[in-house]
Amino acid sequence: MFCLNTFKSRWPREFQNLKKKKKKTCVKLSIPIRSVTGDAASLTVVVTMYKRDDYVRNKPGGVFSRWQGFARSMLLPKPFSETAELRRTVADYSLISRGLAPKILREAKGNREDLRVGKDFVGSRYRVQESIQGLGVAVNIHDADDISHGQTESIRTRLRSYGRPVPLLKKLGDNASQTITQKKTGGRSKDKKHGFEEERDVSRVEAEENNTNSVHASVLRLSRSRPQPVLERHDDIVDGSDSASVCGVLQEDGTTCLTAPVTGRKRCTEHKGQRITCAPPVKNPPCEEETEEICGVILPEMVRCRSKPVSGRKRCEDHKGMRVNAFFFLLNPTERDKILKEDKSKPKTRTSSTNQEEPGESLICEATTKNGLPCTRSAPNGSKRCWQHKDETVDQKSSENVQTSTTVCGVKLHNGSVCEKTPVKGRKRCQEHKGMRITS
């Protein structure tokens, strides 16, 4: 028992109150009283002291005391004529709600006696159908042409309704009810069904107006910064639905030109005088040799070099300073003679297509010039030399002279050998390898 009392003092205050609920305390006070005659008497007074939890708690709602009478009277099942409290609080409500009344009340019918038509109460979960006319001071009743009806929950629909024309609003005024839909915390199924029917009616009327093309109002498109007015005609151009507002010419990539035509014409300035299905003629691509920029040096395999030349030059980095047919004459004379003998030993019965495809394999003059270089002219059919070296004999010792020379060019050839030609006077390389370096 001792341990229980010690732990009881440590418990929180809420648990102590749950364990033992204290009753109210009565205090008796005896006050001595002396009468006029001088006799002594005593007056006993019993004072009842309640605990804090016994008092009636009031929430801090004293600020809203003016509104209590108005709200209570609106929720009571009594007509307006029998509610004196409502008539008394109308003046206070009008002074307070000058700016709030136009948002709550709209198109008041003036029926004061029957306030709750259709059993629609005033509250956070119901809607107001009819209200008192002139309940707030300076309540501006908007004109029927300027009021947005129907879908009040949708911000996009509310913004679009500002541009509706008069005939559309008149149709909406006949069909839609003059109601304001409040935010429902626990709405009923009937209210939801009624709201959906109103939305369907409004959307149906808008679709009919747009189909007849009688409405050319501007549409407000929402953006992150601010709404911007965009014409419906501009939307039609983007979508391509209106064929008269676009050029419509079929382009090369298969798409349709969506540019607006020139005033008074059917086409834009770019497609002036063209038909819709008329595509511009496609030019035949030129030959590969004309379009491609390649090095072009004939390699020992009789194939052109396809590498791109260095900017500002005709050859690539590997064939710098070389002519197109340089490799054919840079070979050793013995190997050159072998190639010529092989060409002679091949049968001459070739098709015309083969001769057209391989024009570079025609015979070359076998003579050697005075500076030791082979002649680059082509020999006519049936002869071994060109017209200049036709009467000269073949210099058999030209190769030996090149090999026995003390100074040679030294440039490494494509087949792995070294150029053994004598360089030009005052230079380190021969005429064919002018400006080239020796690659290790």
UniProtKB/Swiss-Prot annotation:
Record field: compositional bias (Polar residues): 175-184
Biased composition range(s): Basic and acidic residues: 194-207
Keyword terms of this UniProt record: DNA-binding, Nucleus, Repeat, Transcription, Transcription regulation
InterPro entries hit by this protein: Effector_transcript
GO annotation, cellular component aspect: nucleus
UniProt region (Disordered), positions on chain: 172-216, 339-363
Keyword DNA-binding (UniProt): yes
Keyword Transcription regulation: yes
Subcellular location field: Nucleus
Boundaries of every GIY-YIG domain copy: 131-167
GO biological processes: regulation of DNA-templated transcription
Domain of life: Eukaryota
UniProt-recorded Gene Ontology molecular function terms: DNA binding
Cx9Cx9RCx2HK repeats: 247-272, 295-320, 365-390, 409-434
Chief place where the protein resides: nucleus
Note in the entry: Plants over-expressing ET display dwarfism due to short internodes, late flowering, reduced germination rate, increased anthocyanin content and reduced xylem lignification.
Function: Transcription regulator that negatively modulates gibberellin-mediated developmental processes. May act as transcriptional repressor of giberellin controlled genes. Binds DNA without sequence preference.
Free-text domain note: Contains a bacterial GIY-YIG-like domain.
Protein name, per record: Protein EFFECTOR OF TRANSCRIPTION
Species annotation: Brassica napus
Gene name, Swiss-Prot/TrEMBL: ET
